[in-house]
A protein has these predicted regions:
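Extracellular glycan-recognition regions
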Residues: 1-178
Length: 178
């Protein structure tokens, strides 16, 4: 696996990957805020055709917009990130679909869970995002069109747009062809 914007601290211990995000890191393009950010920490590998990415993620979210989860990326203007994002003092399950402009959706999670399981699946030109609180009963968060591309990058991301950084743990990362 490779890094796009390696974080200040990261370790791998078996199937557990721990990272500490740097301050002022984010992926965002234009919508509402008028700025472009392209410096999130992204640990990825290249994938082709249809694929599935799964992981369990937990973090010490404290600052507004602290975020961690999964990401797929074709280039700086075409990407999707999903996971937990800390908004209004609450952990939210979050998805941002970007095709030149970012489109963000969130839903509050019950009682700031210690961890969240994420599953992102590519089916042709569609990306399906699901999440579970227990690792078993997955709910759909988003089904989105995504630009056709023979290959793209898929993996883990974390960022701290407003905060000084936070620590996040990913467990059991799976990236497989379908």
């Amino acid at each position: 696996m490779d890094w796009y914007k390696e974080p200040p601290m990261w370790t791998v211990d078996g199937s557990t990957i721990t990272m500490r995000s740097g301050p002022k890191t984010d992926f965002w393009r234009t919508t509402h805020y008028g700025f472009i950010r392209d410096n999130v920490h992204f640990y990825y590998r290249h994938v082709a055709d249809d694929f599935l990415v799964e992981v369990k993620v937990g973090g010490a979210y404290t600052a507004l917009y602290d975020q961690a989860g999964l990401m797929v990326r074709v280039d700086e203007a075409n990407w999707i990130k999903c996971g937990i994002e800390f908004v209004d003092g609450v952990q939210q399950v979050s998805a941002v679909v970007t095709r030149e402009y970012s489109d963000w959706s969130v839903a509050p999670l019950p009682s700031n869970p210690a961890a969240l399981w994420l599953r992102l699946t590519r089916h042709g030109s569609a990306i399906e995002i699901r999440y579970a609180l227990d690792g078993v009963q997955y709910q759909m968060l988003r089904l989105a069109y995504f630009i056709p591309s023979e290959t793209m990058s898929a993996g883990l991301m974390c960022a701290s747009p407003d905060g000084a950084g936070f620590t996040v743990t990913f467990e059991g990362l799976t990236i497989q062809s379908k």
